């Protein structure tokens, strides 16, 4: 049977960013470098061959300025990767961006969070009959 399945958007985004940033999917490792970006899918919808995902990006850094600067770079890289049609990524748009001041888990770190919508193509796969 031929089907269209959703891509693992967290992995797609991590792969798009890994060349330029230290990027993780949940859970964060106990030991991690700074600055880094955590990628979490928070929702989404499907229509025909296209999926639209809601993704939260969280940048941890030593200062507010660094966290904000890295986040803007992360968003720029994702938009460029979507234009290149990297993997399944097709379009990235920013919903909101906020500096939360400190990371709730590690108060010594600064945190900048963005909510983005990412459009991606579904994958065509064949499921063998059993």
Question: Where do the PLM segments sit?
Answer:
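A short, hydrophobic beta-strand-centered structural micro-motif
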Residues: 32-41
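Short acidic low-complexity segments
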Residues: 24-31
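Charged, amphipathic alpha-helical segments and their flanking helix caps
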Residues: 1-22, 40-130
